[in-house]
A protein has these predicted regions:
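Active-site neighborhoods and metal-handling regions in enzymes and metal-associated proteins
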Residues: 1-213
Length: 213
């Protein structure tokens, strides 16, 4: 779940296990998130947060997804600057006072590869202002891009949010195909194992952090 108010973003996620045997996996990501948040304060290396997530996951019998990460958040930038890893591998950067971060452990079973891969299904899209050369677009394409930039200001969106723009559906598909509109693929665990996610957005201070989601 994401919220954007005048460009200020909060990002959060929960996993609900519909199958009872998957509840331990869902709970493990919640515990890993809680332990990571306890360690978040100005000056802490981001690699330390990743190590905490990994050690917590392993202690509970699960494995973190190594190629999914948390991230810094800035105004109108959901993924900005610093990366918050979910494993203990070297990763540059330290948490900065006053900065906003989304920390989000993704976990899978020990049978999993510990990484996700892309599928062909794409349901989330984004137009990055300033990177689309409007003068190279035809009239309806240019109009659609301008509408998307004005409405979402570079933030991700899904098709159900633009049902009022159905007359542009064909142009949208064409702009996705030629790369002027970026499309995010649906991700799955490489070996087909289940994945859980827990996420909060925090503001980092000198002596800790405040959860705002």
């Amino acid at each position: 779940l994401g919220v954007c108010l005048n460009g200020y973003i909060a990002d959060t996620a929960v996993t609900v296990a519909l199958a009872p045997d998957l509840e331990p996996l869902a709970e493990a990501s919640r515990i890993a998130l809680r332990e990571a948040i306890k360690a978040m304060r100005a000056g802490v290396p981001v690699s330390r947060i990743g190590l905490i997530v990994q050690e917590t996951a392993n202690r509970l019998g699960f494995k973190p997804i190594r190629n999914l990460t948390g991230h810094e958040i800035k105004r109108y930038e959901l993924h900005a600057g610093t990366t918050i890893p979910n494993i203990g591998a070297p990763c540059p950067g330290r948490l900065q006072e006053g900065h906003v971060y989304a920390v989000e452990p993704f976990l899978t079973t020990m049978k999993g590869a510990g990484e996700v891969v892309s599928t062909r299904l794409r349901t989330i899209f984004r137009v990055e202002p300033g990177k689309v050369k409007l003068r190279k677009l035809k009239g309806e394409e240019r109009e659609l891009i301008n509408l998307l930039i004005n409405r979402f200001k570079g933030m991700p969106y899904t098709l159900r949010w633009i049902k009022d723009l159905d007359r542009f559906r064909g142009f949208h598909e064409r702009l996705v195909k030629n790369g002027r509109i970026y499309s995010y693929p649906v991700l799955v665990e490489r070996f087909g194992e289940p994945v859980s996610q827990s996420e909060h957005t925090v503001i980092v201070f000198e002596d800790g952090c405040e959860v705002i989601t």
